[in-house]
């Protein structure tokens, strides 16, 4: 674990973040999304989004790197959900390259996000997770998140509808 460094993202990281996002999302959603939707998860479609997020700190973005290579990232900020108290934060995204799954990178990123949310005055944090993404569900539950069963919603990803549920915990 000590080999990973977590730090705030810079504009130079946008391309690497987009690549991590694409490869990790493709691995996470294989079997959940059809091939044409997985193919649409290309880094080129995400780089501008992450560049803008880093530039304007919305969301705040931290990266995990080893040997100068970005292997994971987390985006977090105040909750985007309507009618949510200003003390509620949200993990907007947390992705790690599949070859680094289970090695503590996600935990290090979550710790950095929790520290950042605490600095922002957040007392609780949420994340939306597709019900069929068992790996993500397990990760967040091991990190202390609890399912809010009354929050289930359907989100369209391209032509596919995905059932999501919000998880929540104290910061």
Regions found by a protein language model. Give the residues of each.
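Acetyl-CoA-dependent GNAT
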Residues: 4, 8-12, 22-32, 36-99, ...
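Conserved glycine-rich acetyl-CoA-binding loop
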Residues: 93-111, 118-120, 130-138, 142
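Alpha-helix N-cap/helix-start and coil->helix boundary motif
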Residues: 11-14, 133-134
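Hydrophobic pocket/interface hotspot
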Residues: 17
